[in-house]
């Protein structure tokens, strides 16, 4: 909603007051944090690592390192070609069960390697807030255009 409001605001400005605007919209952001708030993306991975989820939801999403998101911000400030654009920042996409398998292979043996039935995800989403946002996209592939 904030992005939509920003674009709408820009449309109301006369030409003397207009300015360049770029939206950096990252997908699931992972990596080192600057504060104790680990964010939604990292909290889901932490739940996998701790074995707090018996299986993975059939969620397909994009992943990007937080440092690459920072680089995208710098890039957009230094390159006029990004002016007045909406940039989706994603390194790769995969199903969440693949993340669980990668973690398991990396030594996090509590991480689930099986996919949870969609009906069960919907029940868990009532109690686990991080899952509430994925119920509408269960089983759907999400592929992002990584070109500028």
Positions of predicted regions on the chain:
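Glycine/proline-rich active-site loop of Rossmann-fold NAD(P)-dependent oxidoreductases
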Residues: 15-19, 31-44, 76-87
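Active-site loop of classical SDR/Rossmann-like NAD(P)-dependent oxidoreductases
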Residues: 96, 136-148
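Conserved loop-to-helix N-cap of the C-terminal "lid" that shapes the substrate pocket in Rossmann-like
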Residues: 23, 57-70, 86, 93-96
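Mid/C-terminal beta-alpha module of Rossmann-like enzyme folds, strongest
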Residues: 72-136
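A conserved pocket-lining segment of Rossmann-fold NAD(P)-dependent short-chain dehydrogenase/reductase
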Residues: 29, 33-36, 40-64, 68
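Glycine-rich beta-alpha junction loops
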Residues: 26-31, 93
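Active-site Tyr-X1-5-Lys
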Residues: 1-21
